[in-house]
């Protein structure tokens, strides 16, 4: 199967092609038709599986097919809720890349930064909004964002969102949207609290599970170190200098700590 077989319009296919994509991933193949059919979806998919495109492409397709030029950007019709600013920014960039030929307007709002520039963007009109829970509710409380016309609500990284204590915020956001909306919930894991949330807010959801049978590829050795937070940098330096050889890929939770680690490694000439 190729993207052209998923009933996506020529504008979206052109953008996908320019990014060099031809064959959809498993989560995309399973999720896109369901979302195009306006089904609620609960998907178990880890980062790196292509899940952002799995919900971005059908949202863009659906809004493009129904768009009225006279109402462009006048109402927020799709909302993606993400737990962190870094993820929210990445998602908005993906929407802009995939929707560059659709004329649909996107915006991202998140906390930890000035609210006025975000308000200005919202006032200019938005079709698709990507937001972190706290900032979204702040904007709604000040009557600066209207969720009354949402057609599709996406909850991304739901397990992380609940781990960060956003359960009440997520439920409130869901209630602020129309009852008739489509909901798609994506989560890397499916603990009881995520399943319980899905049972509460989703309507007869279709299930998508692309969790690998074996989480670690063959030939990969796993080692776990229990280390205090204050000793993480020290351990990292020790491993880089004495244990790990060849090319190295390091993951950290946020952009801030990645930048901090990168500066430290440069200082140590590693």
Regions found by a protein language model. Give the residues of each.
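Conserved helicase RecA-like core
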Residues: 2-270
């Amino acid at each position: 199967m190729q993207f052209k077989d998923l009933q996506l319009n020529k504008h979206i296919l052109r953008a996908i092609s320019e990014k060099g994509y031809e064959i959809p991933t498993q989560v995309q193949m399973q999720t896109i038709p369901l979302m195009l059919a306006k089904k609620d979806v609960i998907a178990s998919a880890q980062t790196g599986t292509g899940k952002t495109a799995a919900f971005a492409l059908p949202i863009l397709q659906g809004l493009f097919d129904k768009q009225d030029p006279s109402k462009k950007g006048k109402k927020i019709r799709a909302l993606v809720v993400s737990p962190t600013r870094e993820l929210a920014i990445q998602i908005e960039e993906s929407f802009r890349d995939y929707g560059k030929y659709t004329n649909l307007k996107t915006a991202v709002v998140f906390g930890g930064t000035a609210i006025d520039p975000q308000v200005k963007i919202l006032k200019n009109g938005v079709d698709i909004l990507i937001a972190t829970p706290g900032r979204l509710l702040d904007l709604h409380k000040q009557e600066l964002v209207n969720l009354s016309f949402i057609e599709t609500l996406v909850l991304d990284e739901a397990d992380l969102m609940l781990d960060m204590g956003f359960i009440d915020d997520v439920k409130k956001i869901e209630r602020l949207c129309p009852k008739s909306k489509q909901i798609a919930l994506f989560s890397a894991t499916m603990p009881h609290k995520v399943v319980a949330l899905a049972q509460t807010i989703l309507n007869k959801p279709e299930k998508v599970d692309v969790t690998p049978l074996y989480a670690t590829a063959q030939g990969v050795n796993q080692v776990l170190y229990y280390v205090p937070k204050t000793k993480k940098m020290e351990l990292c330096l020790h491993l880089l200098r004495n244990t790990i050889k060849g090319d190295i890929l390091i993951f950290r939770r946020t952009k801030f700590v990645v930048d901090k680690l990168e500066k430290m490694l440069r200082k140590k000439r590693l």
